[in-house]
């Protein structure tokens, strides 16, 4: 039987990309043109997004979708559908806006009043002239931060609504925390309530059911499923601090909180008689509120999962389709309220794939730490590099429903400076971190240029690099096919910081994550619920001390980011693991408090003594990678440190793959690698991007900037290609250069260049398109095997030698095999396509530099 990797090389692989196609009511002629372009780019699935469509879920929408379905059948395409009139999901096509109050979004708010006593018959007006939906819920009186019993009376107005609170304030300073429910929020007020099952059902009734009614005959056939885009609690938008982090953490003093009757019922049951007295701690970060904050977030995020994600996923699966999408993970919102969903693993729990999203230059090749300005704020690049993709791939590994599948929405809103070279870098970034499905963002059928979140693929033939877009899509399909259907090797379980952060001070995961991946130590992020929810997670500790598994995914140790608080289930696991000889590490500090248990329920938290954390080893974050490397946890061991090398080990159907990626855009990697046990890395090195023959690999790793490869361990390959030391001649010119604008094959008059330089700053300012270089060179003697090396290129290159095409390269290394060449003169033609930002400005590129244009060289013939 042919090995699977050989089948992939021979063209038998699965589709793993489903780009957005924005639907705004365009003509069927335009839609047909775009679907043909999509299918022609080795893409076999597409996700339709109303952006917005003028008649979403109306006759115009159904007419357009029937046309799309007919076209897709002819082209061999399958469909996904974004599940609302516009993003973010939750508008329910306007249904929530017209719904009765109990089906609309509800939040819990408070106002604090200071009363200097003793004061008899102190009075507080309960009416809010700015919010007619606000209703009195309850009051807690406090002195010196502790609840006190104060009798009070509530007087109603003529309509029967509470209007005034009257009480006798005791001596001293008394704070009255008056709590209200409200239907008014500052963000997406007309959206469904994510913690209310009946409210979420409005989305099903308004969008999902009409699609089934009109197109149900195509469910599970042409229509594969639905896509939720960036749903969240939407209790507020929140603000972002100078560190690039959202402020929507539970305990924020001014935050309205998600609320529903079911949330109230569960919260009352969990808190018992202390219920009302504990609620004020939802708006502070004091240790005494750790228990109630954790209980609230635990309930709210669980209800989000049950009411929203599970309900939609169950509806889809019952009708033969799948449910996918992503929430907002940015700015550490994945563990917070606001635009977030509180707990990433629960937020995507009902989906058939995990999902994440990268946008607006949140990745910058060569910059993996620090803050990057994007014009309206800053991004914490350590999070986007080392945590964001791993959230998704970890959920895919841990949830059996997902079968190892994780989707990433990629390329969107970077700006026109993002070309195929950076897109390939982004694709590798996700692939080597375990992501194996992609939603490229986006095909826009609006008139060019469309200012809505470029770049756009094809763009009515005005995106010149679209000519080679299919090469990137084929590469992503091939690589993702190899990295699907098996299991990644992730020896480290990194504890998800959400629970600890809800309770008190906690370090983010990204500091530990960056130390691990920069040392080629792979990991999954594992939530605390894995150690407490036996219904969803099966945890087994190996009796021989070799490690433990969660739902079949094997780990050798647990690493806890530094935190003040920990839960009892994690402590219990640490004790059992230590007894079996499995290491549990805490970074930089040991937890000293519990947020759960009987004592925490009474006092707000429970202090931990040394015995309680004796099974946890304290370790500095800066020592983490070396400690784990010394115990054999590296995916590969390099002869010297390689902080820009990323490595993934993947086992599939008896085959073992190593994906190796150089993530530095300027520096090459040259090293010797071995497996952690000292075994030499030997096998066949695959070039899935350019389709060259598999090369024999003996552990000597050479990767140019932007370059990646997959090594099939134990397989055989051909001889290595020519190296830079084999130079035969240098092509010095002169060069004749002509320009062709996008959408045309015609070239203008040539200009002569004495040397190679940036064309945008000299002969062709403000131009984006194809630059055709012509030159000749003389080979002094015949060569049996030659390679053309173009040096620096911006940014795609197609080479023709003596009238024969040598192919296209969309990123470094720009090397082309030319086989045997006779002595004498040879004609060289090189077509270079730059990026559209040189001709079309956009707001997303206002904080991003422009690359040069053209061929910078040096151009060498190797052989």
Which role does the model predict for each range below?
Residues 199-225:
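An active-site-proximal structural segment forming one wall of the substrate-binding cleft
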Residues 840-863:
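Exposed low-complexity, polar/acidic, P/S/T/G-rich flexible segments that act as propeptides
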Residues 48-166, 177-201:
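Acidic/aromatic-lined carbohydrate-recognition and catalytic surfaces
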Residues 817, 822-824:
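A glycine-anchored, Pro-Gly-centered beta-turn/N-cap motif
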Residues 7, 13-22, 27-33, 45-51, ...:
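Carbohydrate-binding surfaces of carbohydrate-active enzymes
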Residues 777-779, 783-802, 809-810, 828-832:
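Aromatic-lined ligand-binding clefts that engage carbohydrates, nucleic acids, or primary amines
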Residues 184-186, 717-718, 833-840:
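Short acidic/polar inter-strand loop motif in beta-rich domains
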């Amino acid at each position: 039987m042919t090995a699977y990797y050989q089948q992939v090389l021979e063209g038998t692989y699965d589709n793993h990309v489903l780009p957005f196609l924005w639907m705004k009511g365009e003509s069927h002629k335009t839609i047909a043109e775009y679907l043909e372009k999509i299918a022609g780019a080795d893409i076999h699935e597409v996700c339709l997004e109303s952006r917005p469509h003028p008649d979403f879920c109306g006759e115009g929408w159904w007419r357009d979708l029937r046309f799309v379905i007919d076209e897709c059948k002819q082209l061999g395409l399958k469909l996904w559908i974004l599940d609302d009139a516009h993003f973010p999901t939750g508008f329910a096509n306007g249904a929530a806006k017209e719904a009765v109050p109990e089906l609309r979004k509800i939040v819990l708010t408070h106002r604090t009043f200071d009363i200097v006593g003793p004061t008899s018959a102190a009075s507080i007006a309960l009416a809010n002239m700015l919010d007619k939906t606000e209703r009195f819920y309850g009051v807690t009186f406090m002195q010196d931060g502790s609840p006190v019993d104060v009798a009070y009376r509530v007087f109603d107005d003529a309509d029967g609504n509470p209007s005034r609170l009257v009480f006798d304030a005791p001596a001293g300073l008394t704070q009255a925390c008056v709590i209200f429910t409200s239907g008014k929020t500052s963000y997406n007020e007309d959206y469904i309530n994510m913690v209310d099952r009946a409210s979420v059902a409005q989305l099903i009734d308004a969008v999902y059911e009409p699609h089934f009614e009109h197109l149900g005959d195509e469910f599970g056939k042409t229509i594969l499923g639905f896509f939720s885009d960036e749903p969240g609690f939407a209790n507020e938008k929140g603000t972002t601090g100078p560190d690039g982090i959202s402020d929507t953490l539970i305990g924020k003093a001014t935050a309205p909180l998600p609320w529903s009757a079911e949330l109230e019922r569960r919260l009352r049951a969990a808190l018992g008689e202390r219920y009302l007295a504990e609620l004020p701690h939802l708006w502070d970060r004091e240790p005494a509120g750790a228990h109630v904050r954790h209980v609230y977030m635990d309930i709210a995020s669980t209800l989000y999962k049950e009411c929203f994600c599970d309900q939609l996923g169950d509806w889809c699966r019952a009708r033969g389709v799948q449910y996918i999408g992503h929430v907002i993970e940015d700015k550490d919102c994945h563990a917070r309220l606001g635009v977030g969903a509180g707990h990433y693993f629960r937020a995507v729990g009902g989906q058939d794939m995990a999902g994440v999203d990268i946008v607006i230059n949140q990745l910058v090749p060569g910059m993996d730490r620090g803050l990057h300005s994007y014009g309206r704020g800053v991004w914490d690049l350590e999070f986007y590099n080392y945590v964001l993709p791993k959230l998704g791939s970890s959920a895919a590994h841990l949830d059996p429903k997902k079968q190892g599948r994780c989707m990433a929405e990629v390329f969107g809103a970077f700006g026109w400076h993002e070309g195929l070279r950076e897109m390939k870098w982004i694709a590798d970034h996700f692939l080597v971190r375990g992501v194996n499905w992609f939603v490229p963002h986006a095909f826009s059928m609006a008139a060019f240029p469309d200012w809505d979140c470029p770049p756009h693929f094809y763009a009515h033939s005005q995106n010149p690099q679209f000519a080679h877009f299919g090469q990137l899509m084929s590469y992503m399909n091939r690589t993702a096919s190899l990295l699907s259907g098996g299991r990644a090797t992730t020896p480290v379980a990194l504890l998800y910081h959400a629970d600890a952060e809800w309770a008190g001070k906690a370090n983010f995961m990204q500091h530990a994550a960056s130390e691990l991946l920069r040392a080629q130590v792979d990991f999954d992020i594992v939530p605390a619920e894995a150690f407490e929810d036996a219904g969803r997670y099966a945890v087994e500790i190996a009796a021989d001390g070799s490690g433990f598994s969660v739902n079949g995914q094997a780990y050798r140790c647990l690493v806890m980011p530094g935190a003040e608080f920990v839960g009892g289930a994690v402590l219990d696991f640490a004790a059992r693991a230590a007894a079996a000889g499995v290491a549990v590490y805490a970074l930089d500090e040991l937890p000293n408090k519990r947020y759960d248990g009987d004592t925490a329920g009474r006092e707000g938290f429970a202090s931990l003594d040394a015995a309680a954390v004796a099974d946890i080893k304290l370790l500095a974050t800066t020592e983490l990678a070396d400690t784990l490397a010394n115990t054999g946890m590296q995916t590969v061991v390099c002869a010297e440190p390689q902080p820009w090398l990323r490595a993934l080990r993947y086992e599939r159907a008896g085959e073992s793959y190593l994906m190796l990626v150089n993530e530095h855009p300027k520096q090459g990697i040259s090293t010797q690698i071995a497996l952690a046990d000292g075994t030499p890395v030997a096998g066949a090195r695959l070039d899935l991007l350019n389709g060259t023959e598999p090369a024999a690999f003996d552990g000597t790793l050479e990767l140019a900037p932007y370059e990646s490869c997959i090594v099939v361990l134990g397989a055989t390959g051909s001889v290595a290609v020519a190296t830079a030391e084999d130079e035969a001649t240098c092509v010095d010119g002169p060069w004749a250069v002509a320009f062709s604008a996008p959408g045309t094959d015609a070239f203008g008059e040539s200009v002569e260049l004495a040397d190679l330089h940036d064309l945008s700053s000299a002969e062709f300012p403000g131009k984006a398109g194809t630059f055709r270089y012509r030159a000749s060179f003389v080979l002094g003697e015949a060569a049996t095997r030659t390679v053309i090396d173009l040096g620096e290129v911006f940014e795609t290159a197609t080479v023709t030698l003596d009238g024969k095409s040598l192919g296209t390269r969309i990123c470094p290394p720009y090397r082309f095999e030319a086989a045997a060449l006779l002595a004498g003169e040879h004609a060289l033609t090189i077509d270079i396509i730059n990026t559209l930002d040189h001709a079309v400005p956009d707001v997303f590129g206002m904080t991003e530099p422009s690359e040069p244009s053209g061929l910078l060289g040096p151009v060498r013939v190797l052989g």
